[in-house]
Amino acid sequence: MAWLDQSARSLFLAEFVSSFLLAMRYFFKPKVTLNYPFEKGPLSPRFRGEHALRRYPNGEERCIACKLCEAICPALAITIEAGPRRNDGTRRTTRYDIDMTKCIYCGLCQEACPVDAIVEGPNFEFATETREELMYDKNRLLANGDRWEREIAKNIALDAPYR
């Protein structure tokens, strides 16, 4: 019985020493914690944040009202109404709404879009005080696209080889 007691004590001491050495090793390494509101970490080019509608360089909106994003959305968060055909035969949306309270940020709308009109941008700080502020209309989505166009274009270019 004495040998069992002795081996238990030595095992405890060995475990204690190894755990102490592990703690000391990480104690002297550089810290990886970020002070979030003041420091921001890197985002992946594939990060899916706040939605945005993009424009062509001439200022015309990209969305052609094909409604593929509305059809593929598993949460049924997108509502689109298409206007009449224009003289050149193309269509544009008269209504493009996203209910962000339903959105699950899966990115299927972005993948389904044939003209890269709807994208999920790099912004993740869009907290609101009311639910009504999370109902995005076409004007807000276009404003998001205008605000984040440089970052969105860079992320799409980085992701292009994998699409």
Swiss-Prot record:
Keywords associated with the record: 4Fe-4S, Cell inner membrane, Cell membrane, Iron, Iron-sulfur, Membrane, Metal-binding, NAD, Quinone, Repeat, Translocase, Ubiquinone
A GO BP annotation: aerobic respiration
Domain of life: Bacteria
InterPro entries per the UniProt record, alphabetical: 4Fe4S_Fe-S-bd, 4Fe4S_Fe_S_CS, NADH_quinone_OxRdtase_chainI
Matches recorded under Gene3D superfamilies: 3.30.70.3270
Binding residue positions for [4Fe-4S] cluster 1: C63, C66, C69, C113
Membrane topology per record: Peripheral membrane protein
Catalytic EC class: translocase
Predominant cellular place of this UniProt entry's protein: membrane
Pfam families listed in its UniProt record: Fer4_7
Presence of keyword Metal-binding: yes
EC number of this enzyme: 7.1.1.-
Subcellular location per the Swiss-Prot or TrEMBL entry: Cell inner membrane
Cofactor binding, per record: Binds 2 [4Fe-4S] clusters per subunit.
Cofactor: [4Fe-4S] cluster
Coiled coil start-end: none
Signal peptide start-end: none
GO molecular function, one term: iron ion binding
Disulphide bonds in the chain: none
Annotated catalysed reactions: a quinone + NADH + 5 H(+)(in) = a quinol + NAD(+) + 4 H(+)(out)
Function: NDH-1 shuttles electrons from NADH, via FMN and iron-sulfur (Fe-S) centers, to quinones in the respiratory chain. The immediate electron acceptor for the enzyme in this species is believed to be ubiquinone. Couples the redox reaction to proton translocation (for every two electrons transferred, four hydrogen ions are translocated across the cytoplasmic membrane), and thus conserves the redox energy in a proton gradient.
Family affiliation: Belongs to the complex I 23 kDa subunit family.
PANTHER family noted in UniProt: NADH DEHYDROGENASE [UBIQUINONE] IRON-SULFUR PROTEIN 8, MITOCHONDRIAL (PTHR10849:SF20), NADH DEHYDROGENASE UBIQUINONE IRON-SULFUR PROTEIN 8, MITOCHONDRIAL (PTHR10849)
Complex and partners: NDH-1 is composed of 14 different subunits. Subunits NuoA, H, J, K, L, M, N constitute the membrane sector of the complex.
Name by which UniProt lists this protein: NADH-quinone oxidoreductase subunit I
Species: Parvibaculum lavamentivorans (strain DS-1 / DSM 13023 / NCIMB 13966)
Gene transcribed to yield this protein: nuoI
